[in-house]
Regions:
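Short amphipathic beta-strand/extended segments with alternating polar/hydrophobic composition
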Residues: 88-91, 127-129, 227-230, 297-306
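Short beta-strand and beta-hairpin "edge-sheet" elements
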Residues: 289-334
């Protein structure tokens, strides 16, 4: 049992901006994590989670020059922070239209799929699959779409069923999102800035070399904390349940419950109640760290907007209760 003698409450007094970094697949291809956490959400330092993928444009069409086996790709934008020419702050890259991109036909068996991609240099490139006697939907299999390099984005596919050179038909071009094309916003995801992770609504397809998912990157700012003292009575933002019931005929009762998100709060003794540094942080979405013992590893993180209720009692130091309105519960960390 710990006596709360050396506890501290700290607030996000500043931020340290980080460059884009790759997030790690937790194993099920739905949750991706970043070792750097928690993430600031205050104005000017908002975090950006950027899965690789097409944002706008990129329509593939039979080559206007009508060359055999060739396609054109309309200009497009994509999110790919590690790609040559991408913005260092947003991860967005603009790629010019490409013409006469050659898809590959089989030499013996007619069924062959070519992926039309943009590679890590921002260049539109065709990646050929292996020919077969029939199409397959298995990546890397004979007759299937190829595994494309890590750091590339799939724009679409060209599917040939004949070895005879010919002008590409529009029916041989496929760009269904999630099957033949990678979009940055599919599948959708939720973000947990305190834990430093994102969760996708479904598993990311394993279409890249090594049977891995597309890259997911994040640009975040980490907090620089300042201690608030003297402080006491820290209350985390916990979730609570409340039960209710309704009475029906024949002594029947139907119960129900609701879940609500609580606020965090703590009390603080102020210097003059006017010029204290923490007062300037009210109304901002900040990270708050509570340590039960400043000499030990465990801590708790809360993220939310602070508000203050001050009391100025004659003959005493001004005091205040700071309440933190949150969007998610406080999170406990062992280290």
């Amino acid at each position: 049992m710990t006596a709360l003698i050396n506890s501290t409450v700290e607030y996000e007094a500043g931020q340290s901006q980080q460059a884009f970094a790759a997030m790690t697949d937790a194993g099920a291809h739905t949750i991706f994590t970043l070792a750097t956490k928690p993430w600031s959400a205050t104005t000017g330092f908002e975090y950006a989670v950027v899965p690789y993928g097409i944002a706008t444009g990129g329509v593939i069409s039979p080559a206007a020059a009508a060359g055999n086996n060739n396609v054109d790709v309309a200009a497009f934008t994509a999110y790919a922070p590690g790609m040559t020419g991408a913005s260092a702050t947003t991860g967005l890259i603009s790629v010019s239209a490409a013409t006469n991109i050659a898809a590959t036909r089989g030499t013996t068996n007619g069924y062959r799929i070519t992926s039309i991609t943009v590679d890590s240099t921002g260049t539109v490139v065709a990646v050929s699959g292996t020919e077969s006697t029939a199409f397959s939907e298995t990546r890397g299999a004979a007759g299937g779409p190829p595994l494309i390099p890590v750091g590339s984005i799939e724009i679409g596919q060209v599917r040939f069923s004949s070895i005879t050179a010919a002008v590409v038909a529009s029916t041989e071009i496929y760009q269904v999102v999630g099957t033949h094309q990678e979009r940055y916003d599919y599948p959708v995801w939720s973000e947990d800035p305190i834990r430093g992770q994102v969760t996708f609504s479904s598993a990311l397809p394993l279409i890249h070399t090594g049977s891995v998912a597309k890259k997911v990157m994040a640009r975040v700012a980490t907090p620089i904390y300042a201690v608030i003292e003297p402080a006491r009575n820290w209350k985390p933002a916990d979730v609570s349940n409340s039960a209710s019931s309704e009475q029906y005929y024949n002594h029947k009762t139907v119960g129900s419950f609701t879940t609500s998100q609580g606020q965090a709060s703590f009390d603080v003794s102020l210097n003059d109640g006017v010029s204290d540094a923490v007062l300037a942080k009210m109304g901002l979405n900040l990270l708050w760290r509570y340590k039960p013992d400043l000499y030990r590893a465990p801590y708790q993180i809360t993220q939310g907007v602070g508000s203050i209720a001050r009391t100025n009692t004659a003959g005493a130091s001004p005091t205040a209760t700071i309440t933190i309105s949150v969007q998610q519960p406080s999170v406990d960390f062992a280290s």
